[in-house]
Amino acid sequence: MTQLHIVDDFLTEDQMLKIRSNTFLFENSEVETTGSYSWDEIKIFHPIINYLSEHFDLSNAVTYEVWQQENTRPLGWHHDKDEKLWESGELLFPILTSIFYLDVNVVSGGNLFLEDDTVIEPVTNRLVAFGPGVEHYVEPYSGSRHSIIINPWDRFLAS
């Protein structure tokens, strides 16, 4: 598998509070709906992206796909990809996939499984990042789980 980064206690308490109270999440609160944003539109997530740029080559990033999973999960094993192009059979991946666990209170389940059998527990203030094209799965869970997915792209997404 390509690079894997797992960082606990990633943001400061102040940064966490700023994300929780920022209007971006409320204005884009439609869970599981992705949006494509410029660098300037997602300032609240710059600490995350700045870290990612230290460990992945983001020099060609032109847009950032951002969405949240709040007490939801994707069904089944999947790759993060350009969904519109996939409808016509073309498979293109982001530069990387990143998942930031904003708030987690899971009683059971909710682990992230990667194609190489890596299992990652969801933990509040944990950042997980891995390279392109990695198939992954979130197991069913009970409790609450709020994650933010930020995927940098080196091309604009199909519309």
Regions found by a protein language model. Name each.
Residues 57-159:
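Catalytic core of non-heme Fe(II) oxygenases with the double-stranded beta-helix
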Residues 1-67, 72-75:
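Non-heme Fe(II)/2-oxoglutarate
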